[in-house]
Regions:
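Active-site-proximal loop/turn and secondary-structure-junction residues that shape catalytic pockets
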Residues: 61-65, 85-87, 115-116, 163, ...
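Hydrophobic/aromatic-rich, well-ordered segments within soluble, folded domains that form packed cores
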Residues: 78, 82-86, 301-317, 343, ...
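Gram-negative host-targeted secretion-system effectors, predominantly Type III and Type IV
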Residues: 16-19, 131, 138-140
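C-terminal amphipathic alpha-helical interaction region
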Residues: 516-710
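Short linear, low-complexity motifs centered on an aromatic residue
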Residues: 90-106, 125, 225, 232-234, ...
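Glycine-rich, acidic/polar active-site loops that bind/position phosphate-bearing ligands
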Residues: 137-324, 333-336, 343-583
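N-terminal amphipathic/hydrophobic targeting modules at extreme N-termini
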Residues: 1-9, 14
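Active-site core of metal-dependent hydrolases
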Residues: 25-136
Length: 710
């Protein structure tokens, strides 16, 4: 079987409509290059100074930038602008406002001031706030994020912004993400500068590359399923005769209509200046992946949000529907969003790059030790920040990392860190090359890839695989940055007194690594994380196994994690409580919605399908006695009765849930009762579907869906 993957690397040699893509790359993005060209140089320098040194822009500078941005936007067909932000819901929001205004003489004029660029005022009353805001407290503010590029989609200029309440409470995910990067940078450079005397680091950037998985289904088939239309997941559906058993979809031939879809997506991404690196078929039928090149973490999150919007929009243009739910179809793999995490200094040093001699690479050893400690110490926080209720259907299903947080270093690095722990001499592998067929020898990677680990070292970065495909990467990276900062701060306190004595510093480096391994190496696993043996071993080691998102939230409630956010001002106690309540509300809303959809489908689709089958069988049985047909009739009849009972029970559970006021108790009730009942109901419905003839199945089956792209 041919293995195909479209890789663009940095050279865009695809022809679309006769134009070489590199000529159009970034034409819809008001990036640093365009700003430098459009602004008077002194104004550009003021913007750059404000960006680098976190200063406020004066009104004159803001007005000049706004004027240049407006002229550029108008020349590219924009008629409106919007402050674009990411509220606590995790879904981007905006309000379109027109450039056109009216002069004192009543004549039309295009206006856009520095004040309108820097600050906006959307209604904040209807966004999730976890109780921080009352409905009548409507005022909220958006503030321009100078670090991100503005861009044009359609006829709208989008300006990335931070969203806050009237009282200054954080109502979004961008602000805390930027703040968490700053505190990590502040602690990280102090450690780097202890060892790199010749190159002074004044800043560190968190660089993230996100790999987005998704499903594509035919639009007409999608429209015939209420569950797909409402929640993006099939809540009933028997397995297809052929699923992913043959592994013929993974990296296989991309269907022609999907190739056209990819082509359209690429064109939009390139115009926005987003580097689409790779695209390919994933494991499950109808499942695909796109990867975007590494960017500063806040820009990477923006790029991913834009990618998701473009994938959905472009799919519809191609008579397809793009699904981001982590588990839209049972019995085949679900989708994730792999978060590749690295930290780089202002002069390009990647602290997770082991180099040729990792044992003597002090910076590498310390930063990896910090990540080991952070991963183990904040397991529950990482589990929550990488997940959602919808991700529960994927985690731990022998297709994605289990719900247990573990770390894979690879055999070479694990041996290095264990040798330091045991205080034995580390012997580097002599032959670190690989010879391919008819090729020169090439360096061998320092680690294999463990797809079963929640966190895996992959050469010069750590890949966090738990992140759900529908979720923004903001929460996970905020948690990572803060947890890393916490560890790095303690490490620096140990090292700082000996900053002028490298011999003592070196001894302390090994001592710190040993201490971290003594306390936290339980989180390291080099085997099969899917296996029952690992689950039993993880339990013996005391690792958390939160099987559901709600279970992880419960554990988080009992674990004092807030200090890593509070002491550096990332969140206030009020904001942490609010975020926690928003997460609990998500549990309630998700399962309640699924329950309502299940009741509707039972009444309108599933039970009628069973009754239609009985109607067809009844005259045959009246005419001829057939023991097998009679048994089939009885099975379907009993299943219909059971499904009707399930429907009544779900209705009663929903009614009881609606009377619970406390959000924690409500989430617990919904998780323990409604979610459990929905799983049991599905089992009956799926078993009944297997007994129904094709002509009586009114819902598109898995077989129909999986063959809809060819």
């Amino acid at each position: 079987m041919a293995i195909l993957i479209n890789c663009h690397f940095f050279i865009f040699q695809k022809l679309y409509g006769g134009k070489l893509m590199i000529e159009e790359f970034g034409i819809k993005s008001f990036n640093k290059k365009k700003m430098k060209e459009a602004l008077p140089y002194p104004i550009y320098l003021k913007w750059k100074d404000a960006l680098r040194n976190e200063k406020d822009l004066d009104r004159e500078t803001a007005d000049a930038i706004a004027h240049a941005m407006k002229d550029w936007a108008l020349s590219n067909g924009a008629t409106h602008f919007a402050h674009w932000f990411l509220p606590l819901s995790g879904h981007t929001a905006k309000k379109h406002e027109a450039f056109i205004s009216r002069t004192s003489d009543g004549e039309p004029i295009n206006r856009f001031s520095g004040k309108e660029l820097v600050k906006g005022e959307p209604d904040a009353s209807s966004f999730p706030s976890g109780g921080m805001r009352s409905t009548f407290e409507a005022r909220g503010y958006t503030y321009w994020d100078l670090t991100a590029n503005s861009f044009i989609i359609g006829n709208v200029l989008y300006i990335p912004t931070i969203f806050m309440s009237y009282k200054g409470e954080k109502l979004d995910k961008r602000g805390p993400l930027i703040d968490s990067t700053k505190i990590l940078s502040a602690e990280g450079v102090k450690i780097v500068n202890l060892f790199k005397k010749d190159e002074y680091a004044y800043r560190m950037r968190v660089k993230v590359g996100l790999e987005q998985e998704f499903f594509l289904v035919d639009k007409e088939i999608y429209k015939k399923r209420s569950d797909l239309k409402n929640i993006g997941r099939t809540i009933v559906g028997a397995p297809s005769p052929k699923g992913q058993e043959l592994s013929d979809h993974y990296f296989g031939q991309i269907p022609a209509r999907v190739e056209k879809f990819y082509k359209d997506v690429d064109e939009k991404l390139y115009q926005l200046g987003i580097y689409s690196e790779a695209e390919h078929n994933e494991v499950a039928p109808n499942q695909f992946e796109m990867a975007i090149l590494f960017e500063n973490v806040n820009v990477a999150i923006d790029d991913n949000q834009l990618l998701m919007n473009i994938l959905k929009e472009t799919a519809l243009e191609n008579d397809l529907v793009c699904l981001f739910h982590e588990k839209p179809f049972a019995s085949v793999n679900g989708s994730g969003k792999h978060n590749n995490y690295s930290i780089v200094t202002n002069y390009g040093l990647n602290v997770f790059d082991p180099g040729d001699d990792p044992y003597n690479n002090d910076i590498f050893l310390l930063f990896v030790a910090a990540l080991i400690e952070a991963t183990d110490k904040y397991q529950s926080l990482l589990r929550v920040s990488a997940s959602s209720t919808s991700n529960d259907f994927r985690l731990g299903a022998d297709e994605a990392p289990p719900a247990i947080v573990s770390l894979f270093l690879g055999s070479d690095l694990e041996e290095l860190f264990r040798d330091i722990k045991e205080e034995v001499e580390y012997k580097k592998e002599d032959d670190n090359t690989f010879r391919g067929y008819n090729l020169l020898s090439v360096p061998k990677d320092s680690s294999d890839r463990n797809r079963t680990a929640a966190v895996a070292f992959t050469g010069n970065k750590f890949e966090f695989r738990m992140l759900g495909s529908s979720k923004t990467g903001s929460d996970l990276n905020i948690a990572l940055n803060c947890a890393m900062t916490d560890s790095l701060s303690r490490i620096y306190e140990r090292l700082e007194p000996y900053k002028d004595d490298y011999k003592k510093l070196r001894g302390l480096v090994l001592e710190i690594v040993k201490e971290v391994m003594d306390k936290h190496d339980r989180v390291i696993c080099d085997g099969d994380n899917y296996s029952l043996e690992w689950r039993e071993e993880a339990k013996r080691r005391g690792l958390a196994n939160h099987k559901t998102y709600f279970d992880a939230l419960v554990a988080l409630k009992d674990f004092d994690f807030s200090d890593i956010f509070l002491k550096r001002g990332i969140y206030t106690e009020k904001e942490i409580r609010a975020s926690y309540e928003v997460n609990l509300e998500e549990v309630v809303i998700y399962h309640t919605l699924e329950a309502k959809i299940m009741m509707s489908m039972l009444e309108k689709d599933i039970i009628p399908m069973g009754l239609a089958e009985l109607s067809d069988l009844s005259p045959i049985l009246n005419f001829k006695n057939n023991e097998m047909l009679s048994s089939k009739y009885d099975k379907i009849d009993k299943m219909i009765t059971k499904l009707m009972e399930c429907e009544s029970e779900i209705e009663a559970l929903l009614l009881h849930s609606s009377k619970i006021d406390d959000i924690y108790k409500k989430a617990e009730y919904v998780e323990r009762n409604i979610a459990t009942k929905l799983r049991a109901t599905r089992e009956v419905a799926d078993d009944m579907e297997k007994l129904i003839s094709r002509k009586n199945i009114t819902l598109p089956s898995y077989e129909d869906i999986f063959n809809s792209l060819s």
